[in-house]
Amino acid sequence: MLCHELDLSDSPRRAHFEHFRHMPDPHVGLTVDVDVTALVQRCKQEGWPFYPAMIRVAVMAANAVPELRRRIRGETVVEYDACDSSHIELLDDGSYCYCTLRHDPAQSWPDYMAYAEAQRAKARAGASIEEEDDVEGLYFITSVPWLHYREFIHPNPGPEASNPSIAWGKYQADWRGRLMMPVTLSAHHSLVDGLHIASFYQNLNQLLQGKNEKGRSKN
């Protein structure tokens, strides 16, 4: 994953960066219900598991927002060209392990799903919560498929932790028959504001409806 250092000297958010950076808990997050009807239907038609499909869509939505690709590195900020993901895999004994997925937007859906399933199986066999590589360029992803929740609080190792975290819960039908699912995004407020969080959800909704970030239907 390639990245470059940002020059914050003349950034309009320089003051905001310094202000939130020194707070004991500088993280901000929102939970929003999103319509996953189309993705659930496609997964059923293709015989795909929903979890890795949703991971891909969430990563695509996040990568379309530059602020979510930024990380605090010491006294500097770096921006990745694109970020990959580390997600939780549930194990048979009720514990969990971590699984890293690489995300290539040019990869076809069938190829991605085959790759993701192979990586998930490998991770479960290893059953480790030790990350394979440097985690700086990753999104941290988890799922709580047993609950349709209203709020989710991500654990953070400290105020310098700047990897965005994404979670979702159980999808269920609303009064219109749409399958709605809570999705939570948490990020470092020194790097990300409400506008950027809103952009993530706009991208996510468009992708879930089969559109790209510009709103045009995908082939």
What kind of region is each of these model predictions?
Residues 212-219:
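Short, basic, low-complexity termini and linkers enriched in Ser/Thr/Gly/Pro
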Residues 22-41, 82-107, 180-186:
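Acyl/amide activation-and-transfer machinery of modular secondary-metabolite enzymes
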